[in-house]
């Protein structure tokens, strides 16, 4: 009987859905209590039902309103005076969606190569900032080069060409970053994505605070709460550096010029500079609690913003001054458009290059307009000529101005309108083009495109290098036999590249440069090379010491007495080496400047003569060797020991200046050298320079030497074997490594590198090993959370951090429909105002200066502990004052203090700040470079398939 009654009760309970009613009563107790009271009053006081109907109508309206709208229905913004408008930038017109073609101007152009997109080639075009901000950024980048490039680069060479390329690359990177920042809506990213990540971070801190009572252990407890969800860069400092390297490599295709990633050495250098020397200290600076406090004060400070003490500086092109080349001598590979057009073979190569780029019609437009101008500028035009010109103009308009044309070139709208008006009008109006500027400006625009975009690209193309080496691709034997070495005359005779084109003329001789080698002034043995292949001897310069009175710098038949000459070496200078062996580098080498005063011709009525001669370090030893060969050794005139290994740079030559000056002065005092032709040539500006350019340590073709060793051993049959082996070992022995400066970034676990990588603030981050087993904590990040927008974030913080009472939480849920959109619109507006204040010129310069000091001023005194504590105290007070008084009355003063203290303590943990910084950095990188999301999806799909 009892089971039957129980079964009937369960069925009745299910039919009446009592569980649902009980759940409704639990969630809405106040509403259910009022509804129950109203129902009881209606039954007991049915005589007053007409009065109670007012309350029943109100309940019915509330239920209908709630059911019709639902919690997801939101009222629009009710503050009509506050409207947030995303930034409308002129940059977007120049680069719509970042896909504006440099030729036709079309969005997502499919005709021309992606490398022709203006953003991909010259992203700094029309990008201007205030001169003070530009100067601050330039100073930071100059310090990057001065601290991480020049210390080792100056030991290699003094040529600035490579550093100039690096400057352009850094400008390209900064310009791309600025342009991509301009394209995103910063307030929307902050409110929709960054704050959501911050909510997750706050939840972890709250959970950790519940487990520890002392603030000192809050950071470690929070790291344990993160568990396996801790960012990979936080495991250790080395993992952080490795992560930044990988991130930099991922960004290279988007932040470097096209084809720059093909140069592995350049990408490695830039990766180490950016990851280890820029990004790592910058993130340390941002995660520093002192920096966080400073930024919080700027954000929550309601006082009027500090006004600039100086007027706004003028706008200047972005980093133009920083990117100006320091190497004054132009590159030997540089060409001008005029030079290309003057040579048929170069013009043919250039047209092939344009054809590959899909832009041959750009050159065709220039040629067509030039021909058109020649015809239209004639004094008197007949009707037939005007008709022909009008037809030609119509072809130009249809071919290069219409949007549907495949050969469209982007012009300013007024140019297109003027050309269209003449092309569609009567033919006699074509003469108006003689005085109109539209066609001339179109021509100037296309000519600028050819000169500034395509000509530099052509100078780095395969077509141009084929032109340079067209004689070296299949060199004949005769070309090698004629001359094996190159002299300065090959370059001196080349006055104009457009006339004789010196590089291509001597290109066929390059292959024979490295055939014979010299070690310490002696020729290496001939190792039995194949007959007919390398059986020639490099042309040498025979020097004969003639004591006859033949003048080097004066008229003939005049006696010469070198003892009466006065010489001095006042300074060391730089000389651009034009020798063919170094034609690729064109390096600037240090030389001694020898001032010569000739006084030996006063007897015949001549005034003293003065001139200067520039001699290299090794030329002195060639002079000493040849003087010893002809005259024997001079015990009182000896050069210091020759430096074989190690840099012979400016500082080294400067230290040897006095010794070399004393050596020359003593040579002049020797009677047997008073009429020496060799010494006179050395001191003469045109006295046989090439005879002193002895190759002391040239390149050795080790491959051919090693191949020839067995044949040489068989031919020698043991004779003179020991000297041969010694010479062979000496020629093949690698030079001793030069002492290097401290590394750019940290690769090896040395004490010096550890000192740079680890610091007292962050130590070793979370100090986790890769194979450490970590506890699988509750994964907050996989939980379903319907928190979206600032209103929901405030409710979440109020519930989790400030522990608002239930009635206030329900009230906020009720007003969510009314005020959510309004609050979020106001928040976007407020953030935009704060960002505008932050990006004011004087504030931006101040932030850049702080960043500069944090990265480069390692030797300066950091902020004292008292200053940091004072800043932290001010931040806490500002946070306390930022909470509205109405909320304080609802939650209480004590709860307010504890909640603010919890948030403040969480921001004073450097490693936790670094965790939040990297999470936010990942979000920002994905917003700035959405292409990375596609790459990640492709990698994920491939991984899942495998």
Curated annotation (Swiss-Prot):
Example of a GO biological process term: autophagosome maturation
InterPro entries xrefs: Phox_assoc, PX_dom, PX_dom_sf, RGS, RGS_sf, RGS_subdomain_2, SNX14_PX, SNX14_RGS
TM ranges: 24-44, 49-69
Domain spans labelled RGS: 336-468
Expressing tissues: Widely expressed both in fetal and adult tissues.
This protein's record includes keyword Iron: no
Cross-referenced SUPFAM superfamilies: PX domain, Regulator of G-protein signaling, RGS
Topological relation to the membrane, as annotated: Multi-pass membrane protein
Gene Ontology terms: cellular component: cytosol; dendrite; intracellular membrane-bounded organelle; late endosome; late endosome membrane; lysosomal membrane; lysosome; postsynapse
Name under which the protein is recorded: Sorting nexin-14
Domain of life, source organism: Eukaryota
PROSITE patterns: PX (PS50195), PXA (PS51207), RGS (PS50132)
Family: Belongs to the sorting nexin family.
The keyword Phosphoprotein appears for this protein: yes
Known role: Plays a role in maintaining normal neuronal excitability and synaptic transmission. May be involved in several stages of intracellular trafficking. Required for autophagosome clearance, possibly by mediating the fusion of lysosomes with autophagosomes. Binds phosphatidylinositol 3,5-bisphosphate (PtdIns(3,5)P2), a key component of late endosomes/lysosomes. Does not bind phosphatidylinositol 3-phosphate (PtdIns(3P)).
Classification of source organism: Eukaryota, Metazoa, Chordata, Craniata, Vertebrata
Keywords: Cell projection, Disease variant, Endosome, Intellectual disability, Lysosome, Membrane, Neurodegeneration, Phosphoprotein, Protein transport, Spinocerebellar ataxia, Transmembrane, Transmembrane helix, Transport
Single GO term (MF): phosphatidylinositol binding
Domain PXA: from-to ranges: 130-304
Residue span(s) of domain PX: 570-690
Phosphoserine found at: 548
